[in-house]
Amino acid sequence: MNLEGIEDYGVKNIYSKIAPHFNSSRTYVWQWVKDIMKDIPKGSKICDIGCGNGRNMKFDGVNFYGLDNCEQFVDICKSQGLKVKLGDMCSIPFNSFSFDAVMSIASFHHLSNYPRRMTALYEMKRIIKPNGMIVLSVWSFNQPKKTRRVFSNYGDNIVTWDQYGKIYERYYYIFRITELKDMFNDIGLVIEKHFWDCGNEIFVLRKAEYYEK
């Protein structure tokens, strides 16, 4: 698989074409997201990295800010009154120590190489407060039997999107758990919680120094 430029033509470009269809078909908020949000104090400031159509930014009592690299998604979010910026998760346009929590739900797996993945983790860590947390989810190799998503290998994958009979190919990277754990450790993030839900690997992360007090 030729990965040169794949984040542009296999992620950003594809989502720009399917954004309206995605928006109309992806309105449900996963139960595990709702459960995590119950534990986040009211008044918290949260950044949703790769926020898409903003479906996870509509909880009462918290201040959400979003980031996405797809202009069409940013426009959809703004039309709903959500505070969203256009940008890259490897260069997050927010100040250091700005947020109580960062959420990156089903977006980190679109990064195509190790340096960009580590840079994105560093950026997420940079913008959370010393006692802040990161909630990160990626698609799992282990998918439910009822799903049409079946992965034959870890690493680089193409997953199709059917928009009224027209097929679009999206890039995904399917991680080994050990691979993610090594990256978290190298960047100075501690896993507070890890669980699987509906084909997703979900991690709740804290800065290592949070545990060194």
Model-derived regions, located:
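Class I (Rossmann-like) S-adenosyl-L-methionine-dependent methyltransferase catalytic domain
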Residues: 1-47, 52-91, 115, 119, ...
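A short glycine-rich, Lys/Arg-flanked "PGG" loop and its adjoining helix->strand segment in the class I
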Residues: 118-130
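A short SAM/SAH-binding and catalytic strip from SAM-dependent methyltransferases
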Residues: 101-115
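Short alpha-helical functional segments enriched in proximate histidine and acidic residues
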Residues: 110, 127, 183
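A short acidic, Gly/Pro-enriched loop at the edge of an enzyme's catalytic core
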Residues: 90-102
